[in-house]
Regions:
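Predominantly a Rossmann-like dinucleotide-binding segment in NAD(P)-dependent oxidoreductases
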Residues: 1-95, 104, 122-124, 128-131, ...
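C-terminal helical cap and adjacent loop that interface with cofactors, partners, or active-site loops
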Residues: 57, 64, 68-81, 85, ...
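Glycine-centered tight beta-turn/hairpin loop motif at sheet-sheet or coil-to-beta transitions
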Residues: 109-113, 136-137
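Flexible, glycine/threonine-enriched loop-and-boundary segments that flank and lead into catalytic domains
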Residues: 113-121
């Protein structure tokens, strides 16, 4: 709901950029925070207080944070990737079982590949952005659109409440309810989340992961209907067990 992103999407829909051939999405920044375990603290309480450190709680930062950039890629390209191959690692975290960084190649088919990079390490170069290349130019997610051959793009007027897209999305939500035209983005949210999970699984295991591995029971994939433990049921019945701190997935073995 940010005006600049809407304008970029509109330009792509109008064909100004031509077919998207590739791009890169980044969320490279510093660490968030972590909580040390308290004496006598239950596994459930520790995991909840330290949720940004456990894959079972946040999905790892490729899912919890970098998903925003991955979502832009899916939105602009108009489809989900067919497969992913990635890697990652852990260098500075002290608690939990997450990686510090991920690097994933998403293949969207039709000759389009997106390089995905995310990192949570202090003292490094930071970048949070998206870049796309089409047959007729390039653009950042937030613009500007730079074309090889000029195209006259007549942008519509976009409402931007108080200059904030985070306020505007609530305006759109409430307006949809009032007007009887509710917005349902559940499919887009689910697909972007699954795209990030696909990248995470590839990085954890070191294997090529296909979209159908996660969505098609006939694929006989070990990752179909994957469920992390502990889950909601374990927290509700009091049996939640925290994974060991600083024990992480090893590619080639996970």
């Amino acid at each position: 709901y940010a005006t600049n992103y809407r304008k970029t999407k509109f330009a792509i829909e109008q064909g100004a950029l031509g077919p998207i051939l590739g791009g890169a999405v980044y969320w490279c920044g510093g660490k968030l925070w972590h909580q040390e375990r308290r004496d006598g603290e239950s596994d459930a309480d520790y995991m909840v207080r330290n949720w940004v450190s456990f894959t079972e709680m946040s999905g790892d930062h490729i899912v919890e944070q970098h998903i925003h950039n991955i979502d832009v890629a899916n939105w602009f390209i108009g489809r989900t990737p067919k497969l992913a191959i990635g890697f990652g690692g852990r260098a500075r975290r002290k608690t939990g079982n997450q990686f510090d960084f991920f690097d994933v190649d998403f293949d969207y088919d039709e000759g389009c590949r997106i390089h995905s990079m995310c990192r949570q390490v202090n003292g490094c170069y930071n970048q949070v952005s998206e870049l796309f290349t089409g047959s007729n130019g390039t653009t950042y997610g937030s613009g500007p659109v730079k074309l090889i051959k000029a195209v006259d793009i007549k942008y519509p007027e976009y409402e931007q409440a108080t200059g904030s897209e985070m306020v505007q999305e609530h305006v759109e939500l409430l307006r949809g309810i009032i007007d009887g035209k509710p917005i349902n983005a559940a499919k887009d949210v689910a697909e972007s989340t699954l795209t990030a999970i696909m990248g995470r699984i590839s990085a954890y295991t070191g294997q090529l992961v296909r979209w159908r591995d996660l969505t098609d029971a006939a694929s006989n994939s070990p990752w179909y209907n994957l469920k992390l433990k502990p889950g909601l049921e374990e927290f509700e019945n009091g049996t939640a067990k925290a994974p060991a701190d600083d024990v992480v997935a090893i590619p080639g073995e996970a």
